[in-house]
C-alpha cells in the first residue's frame, strides 16, 4: 500500500478508483482525521501544470462556500512532488451516470429528479455569486453523497473546466462543455454567460427521465440538427449574429420564407465535410412536450381510476417538463435565472455527516416569475425513501449507450478534453 505525504498530512492509498489519459483518481485514508478521501493524481509536467493552476484558482475562489449548503465538493488540499500533482477531496459515493448504469438506465421518478435539480440549481446560484461558470455540467459531474443514508443528496464536482466569467466573456470560440450538454450559444458562436450551465442542467434532467441523452450528437452538426428537429430553428437575429451559423445553416432560397435561414441537410453536410451524420437518439422528439409521454409518462391520465401516487407522478412530470422548456431555450436570456438568493435554507447537518434534505426549500426568487416550474420546486413534501435505484420502469437501451461502455472517473473527464 503506497503512502503519499503533504506538508501537513499523510495519506495511505487504498485503491485506484479510475484512470484517465493523463492521470488517475485514488481512494485514500487520511491519517490525521481517519477519513476516506478521493485523491486526483496527475503527472507533473508543463501541460498538466496549466490545468491544475486553473482548477486550483477556482477551488480557492470557492473556499468561502459551505460545501454542504452550496452542494459542491469539499476540497481539502493540494500538494506535489517531483513526479505528481495531488488534489485531495472528500470521498463521495458515485456519479449520476454510474447510478443510471447500475439501474440499467431506468427512468428516474420525477420526484427524485426534482430533488437533484433543486440542489444543482442551488450550487449554480452560489457559483454565480462568485462569477464562476462551471462549463461542464453533466451526469458524471453530479455526485451522490451517500445514497443509503441521504438518498439523492448530490454535490457538483470537477472544476477543471470552470472559468471566471470576466476572464472568458470575450473569448470568441471557447471550447467548453461536453457536447451532449453544450449550449446553443457555444455551438453557434454567440456571446455567452453563466446560463450555459442552465442549459446543461435541463439536458441532464431530461436524460434522467429518458434514460438516454436528449441530444447525443456525434459532432456539432448532429447536435444542432437534433436541437432544431425538436425545438425548431433559432430566430433569424440569432443566426445573423452567430459566428458559426454557416457551419450548420444556409440561406433560404425562397425570399418570402418566414426564416431567411434553413438547416443544412445531412446530404449538404456530407458533401461539405465528408462526414456522414449519424442517428444516435433513442427518442426522436418533435417537441420538448413529448418528454412527458416517454417511459410511461402520462399513464395516470389514461387510467380509469388512477391511484394518488400515479396522479402525483403525472403532475410532477408535467411540471418538470415545463421547467425543462424554460431551461432549454435558444436564447439564453429567456432561460430561468439563478438568483443570488436561491435556496438559502441550510440543510441539517451533524457530526456524522449531512442529514437527509427534508427541510430543503427553494427561494421563490430563484425564478423570474412564480410560474409552474417554481411551484414544482417549491413542493414541500420531499420523498426520500432509502432506496438505491429508481423503480424498474421503462425499456433498456435498444443499442449501446451513446456515452460508450465505460466513462472514466468524473474527476478525470476534463483532463482528456470534451467529447
Regions found by a protein language model. Give the residues of each.
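Catalytic-loop of the protein kinase fold
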Residues: 128-146
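C-terminal lobe substrate-recognition/regulatory segment of protein kinase catalytic domains
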Residues: 236-323
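Activation segment signature within eukaryotic-like protein kinase domains
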Residues: 116-117
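Conserved N-lobe beta3->alphaC-helix segment of eukaryotic protein kinase catalytic domains
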Residues: 36, 41-69
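Conserved catalytic-loop aspartate of Hanks-type protein kinases
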Residues: 197
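Intrinsically disordered, low-complexity regulatory tails and linkers that flank structured modules
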Residues: 349-419
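A conserved loop-to-beta-strand element in the N-lobe of protein kinase catalytic cores
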Residues: 81-90, 97-98
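Conserved N-lobe ATP-binding subsite of Hanks-type protein kinase domains
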Residues: 24
Amino acid at each position: 500500500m503506497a503512502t503519499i505525504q503533504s506538508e501537513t498530512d499523510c495519506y495511505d492509498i487504498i485503491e485506484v478508483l479510475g484512470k484517465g489519459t493523463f492521470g488517475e483518481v485514488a481512494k485514500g485514508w487520511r491519517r490525521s482525521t481517519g477519513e476516506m478521501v478521493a485523491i486526483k493524481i496527475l503527472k507533473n509536467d508543463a501541460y498538466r501544470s496549466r490545468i491544475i493552476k486553473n482548477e486550483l484558482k477556482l477551488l480557492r475562489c470557492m473556499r468561502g462556500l459551505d460545501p454542504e449548503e452550496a452542494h459542491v465538493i469539499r476540497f481539502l488540499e493540494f500538494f506535489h512532488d517531483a513526479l505528481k500533482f495531488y488534489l485531495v477531496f472528500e470521498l463521495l459515493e458515485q456519479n449520476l451516470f454510474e447510478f443510471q448504469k447500475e439501474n440499467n438506465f431506468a427512468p428516474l421518478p420525477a420526484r427524485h429528479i426534482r430533488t437533484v435539480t433543486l440542489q444543482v440549481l442551488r450550487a449554480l446560484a452560489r457559483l454565480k455569486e462568485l462569477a464562476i461558470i462551471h462549463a461542464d455540467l453533466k451526469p458524471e459531474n453530479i455526485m451522490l453523497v451517500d445514497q443509503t443514508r441521504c438518498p439523492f443528496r448530490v454535490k457538483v464536482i470537477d472544476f477543471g473546466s470552470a472559468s471566471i466569467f470576466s476572464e472568458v466573456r470575450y473569448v470568441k470560440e471557447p471550447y467548453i462543455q461536453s457536447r451532449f450538454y453544450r449550449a446553443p450559444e457555444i455551438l453557434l458562436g454567440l456571446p455567452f454567460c453563466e446560463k450555459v450551465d442552465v442549459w446543461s442542467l435541463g439536458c441532464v434532467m431530461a436524460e434522467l427521465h429518458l434514460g438516454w441523452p436528449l441530444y447525443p450528437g456525434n459532432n456539432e452538426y448532429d447536435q444542432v440538427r437534433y436541437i432544431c428537429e425538436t425545438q425548431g430553428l433559432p430566430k433569424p437575429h440569432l443566426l445573423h449574429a452567430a459566428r458559426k451559423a454557416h457551419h450548420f445553416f444556409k440561406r433560404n432560397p425562397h425570399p418570402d420564407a418566414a426564416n431567411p435561414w434553413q438547416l443544412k441537410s445531412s446530404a449538404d453536410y456530407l458533401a461539405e465535410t465528408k462526414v456522414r451524420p449519424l442517428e444516435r437518439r433513442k427518442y426522436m422528439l418533435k417537441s420538448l412536450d413529448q418528454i412527458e409521454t416517454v417511459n410511461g409518462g402520462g399513464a395516470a391520465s389514461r387510467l380509469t381510476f388512477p391511484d394518488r401516487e400515479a396522479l402525483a407522478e403525472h403532475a410532477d412530470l408535467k411540471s418538470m417538463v415545463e421547467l425543462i422548456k424554460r431551461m432549454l431555450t435558444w436564447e439564453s436570456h429567456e432561460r430561468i435565472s439563478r438568483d443570488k438568493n436561491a435556496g438559502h435554507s441550510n440543510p441539517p447537518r451533524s457530526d456524522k455527516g449531512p442529514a437527509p434534505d427534508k427541510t430543503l426549500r427553494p427561494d421563490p426568487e430563484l425564478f423570474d416569475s412564480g410560474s409552474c416550474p417554481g411551484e414544482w420546486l417549491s413542493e414541500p413534501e420531499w420523498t426520500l425513501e432509502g432506496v438505491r435505484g429508481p423503480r424498474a420502469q421503462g425499456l433498456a437501451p435498444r443499442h449501446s449507450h451513446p456515452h460508450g461502455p465505460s466513462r472514466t472517473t468524473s474527476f478525470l473527464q476534463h483532463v482528456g478534453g470534451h467529447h
